[in-house]
């Protein structure tokens, strides 16, 4: 986690499931989607939940690498693209942060409906639908990036 982040926001599997289902609820009144494009890796779990809720069986991926295990990388690498302009497709990611990945994907698939579970202010204008806004200086701890362990109470953390 780089120095630009002042807070952390841990998300449990249960919360991610609830928030992904809430995103699916918001997408119900949109046009019919012929399939989902999950941005790997973060978009895969939300995409599976949304696919179930919207009864979508066709799922593809686009692979963009913009983070290493610790922090953002300098460039976004396209590891696997998508054929077509995205018309009729639902593009899913876990989070839009600075918008760098979103810009790359929107240029590749400009007609897809872009939805994320979480959005930060810098990237929010690039998505069509999202559920929860998180401050720009917050690092989100997704459940696939964490292990269960003791955490000090908030009051104890502030006194350090």
Curated annotation (Swiss-Prot):
Q: Where does GMP bind?
A: 97-101, 139-140
Q: Give its localization.
A: Cell inner membrane
Q: Which residues bind xanthine?
A: 97, 140
Chief subcellular location equals membrane
Membrane topology designation: Peripheral membrane protein
What residues bind 5-phospho-alpha-D-ribose 1-diphosphate, as annotated? 41-42, 93-101
Which example biological process does GO assign this protein?
Answer: purine ribonucleoside salvage
UniProt-annotated binding residues for guanine: 97, 140
Question: What reactions does this protein catalyze?
Answer: GMP + diphosphate = guanine + 5-phospho-alpha-D-ribose 1-diphosphate; XMP + diphosphate = xanthine + 5-phospho-alpha-D-ribose 1-diphosphate; IMP + diphosphate = hypoxanthine + 5-phospho-alpha-D-ribose 1-diphosphate
Q: List, separated by semicolons, the cofactors it needs.
A: Mg(2+)
InterPro entries assigned: PRibTrfase_dom (IPR000836), PRTase-like (IPR029057), Xanthine_Guanine_PRibTrfase (IPR023747)
Describe the protein's quaternary organization and the partners it interacts with. Homotetramer.
Protein name as it appears in the record: Xanthine-guanine phosphoribosyltransferase
């Amino acid at each position: 986690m780089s120095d630009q982040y002042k807070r952390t926001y841990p998300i449990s599997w249960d919360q991610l499931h609830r928030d992904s289902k809430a995103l699916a609820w918001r997408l119900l009144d949109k046009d019919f989607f012929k399939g989902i494009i999950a941005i790997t890796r973060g978009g895969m779990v939300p995409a599976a939940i949304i696919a179930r809720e919207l009864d979508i069986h066709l799922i593809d991926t686009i692979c963009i690498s913009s983070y290493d295990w610790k922090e953002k990388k300098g460039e976004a690498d396209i590891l696997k693209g998508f054929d077509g302009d995205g018309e009729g497709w639902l593009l899913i990611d876990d989070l839009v942060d600075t918008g760098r990945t979103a810009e790359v994907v929107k240029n590749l698939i400009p007609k897809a409906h872009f939805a994320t579970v979480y959005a930060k202010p810098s990237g929010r204008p690039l998505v069509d639908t999202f559920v929860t806004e998180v401050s720009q200086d917050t690092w989100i701890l997704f459940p696939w990036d964490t292990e269960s362990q003791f955490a000090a109470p908030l009051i104890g953390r502030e006194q350090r």
